[in-house]
Amino acid sequence: MRNAVIVDSVRTGLAKSFRGGFNNTRADNMTAHVVNALLERNPKVDASMVEDIILGCGNPEGAQGHNIARNVAVLSDLPIETGGVTINRYCSSGLNSIAMAATQIQSGFYDCIIAGGVESISTSQGHTNMHMYVNDKLAEEVPGIYHAMGTTAEAVADRYNVSREAQDEYALSSQQRCAAAQDAGLYDDEIIPMETKMILKNKETGAEKEVDVTVDRDDCNRPETTLDGLSSLNPVFNPEGGSVTAGNSSQLSDGASVTLIMSEEKANELGLKPMAYFRGFTTVGCQPDEMGIGPVYSIPKLLDSAGLTVDDIDLWELNEAFASQVVYLSLIHISEPTRLGF
């Protein structure tokens, strides 16, 4: 089987949903912008070499529906022959798109694919088609499948004894590390600035107006966060006795990211140095009402298939949306905080 390599990866800044710079920007326009930037900074890769775009999208309907991946291919500087497919595995949709691209390259079906993810919560949340949305049998027998993610985070905290203090401490550490990375310019090379128009709303009158903005950095993190501030926040999903707050949960954000993936042979032919090699991917289902603990089961499966152990991995990224999930996962698998990405 061939090696699949990641050659380059770019993204927009992450903007606060509804209140940030992308609150009036279509998801397909965001993504086409970063696709073009990816092509521009890799001139050895002719656009005609890109055979497909695979995009993950957690809510692929409305303004980000109609097979957004194909729309992006046509909107961008790629030729009409480049295909596009949109996949949905909710929060891991973008990751799954990269895995899908890599495995197709490993299998020899493709040489060069652009894969990534996009989400415009500003233009999609509240605009979902709710016609026949709930399956009555599922709702009765497995109600957790329709729970809000924050409700599942509360279930994890409750069932596995993850304290409010541990969640807030992790959240503070995450904010501090993110701020340090921004200050050190560690994100600068991957973020592609984008000029767009956002909607500003007057809080007193409700009047709205469009203003020109440039999104060139992440604006969702809060560098000024303190432990006292976190501990003062009220629980959101279970006001009576819960522990999941706005401070120890991920924010809602808008943004797009794309990655250039190709066979190692093609990269060598073009004189391109890989950033990384794709080594494996797996999935394991768990009870829907505690969906955030999936990595408890998928990590051992993936390591076993690769013949590795937890200690063989220098840095882990547990990309979960709630501190309760990350704290529990790290207790199970990763005992050294310095080896855990934020």
Range-by-range predicted roles:
Residues 1-15:
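N-terminal amphipathic/basic leader segments beginning at the initiator methionine
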Residues 10-13, 24-33, 44, 169-269:
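N-terminal extracellular/periplasmic Venus flytrap/periplasmic-binding protein-like
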Residues 13-39, 59-62, 85-99, 140-148, ...:
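Active-site pocket-shaping loop/turn-to-helix segments
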Residues 22-113, 118-136, 191-215, 289-290, ...:
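Conserved beta-ketoacyl condensing-enzyme motif
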Residues 87-118, 157-187, 258-265:
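Active-site-proximal alpha-helical scaffold in enzymes
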Residues 121-158, 220-245:
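Glycine-/small-residue-rich "gating" segment that lines the acyl/pantetheine channel
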Residues 213-246, 252-255, 259-323, 327-331:
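A glycine- and small/hydrophobic-rich beta-loop-beta segment
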Residues 332-342:
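Single conserved hydrophobic/aromatic residue that forms the stacking wall/gate
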